């Protein structure tokens, strides 16, 4: 049972069951509430608060820049902000690391909620937010939260992201499967 979560422009998901079949369910996790506090982040599109998209995407990175103390021009677009945060992370900036640790903490606490609806043995994490050292930190922090706060799930659910070689193979397979136009 694999739950895939793409953390990029939004938060997209897909699920394969115990028979390795993709279910016919709509696995749209972007608007699933994961933060039930009154001061949860509000989604700019739906107006809802606490939606996963604000915790596992470029929106999360952008929202966490100011509280981290990282100095990035607020007028930049979310993709550009993400690139600058990634560059800061690769350079060893502790403020950038705080952003990724926070996202990893969010993920660690959200996985048990996802597990209420999906039988998860493996979680495949994808998307641009997971690129580089920041992605590694997100995964390690989420694993730490699972291990410390939800030990049974921590033993049952593994987290991973494909390495660059696997990403390239996946892109080649996808390109080869496209129909001729």
Task: Label each PLM-derived region with a short phrase.
Residues 3, 18, 38-181:
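ATP-binding/phosphotransfer module of carbohydrate and carboxylate kinases, centering on a glycine-rich
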Residues 26-44:
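Acidic-enriched catalytic cores of C-N bond-cleaving enzymes acting on peptides and small amides
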Residues 4-6, 11-17:
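Short beta-strand scaffold segments in enzyme catalytic cores
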Residues 8-11, 33, 129:
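Glycine-rich beta-alpha junction loops
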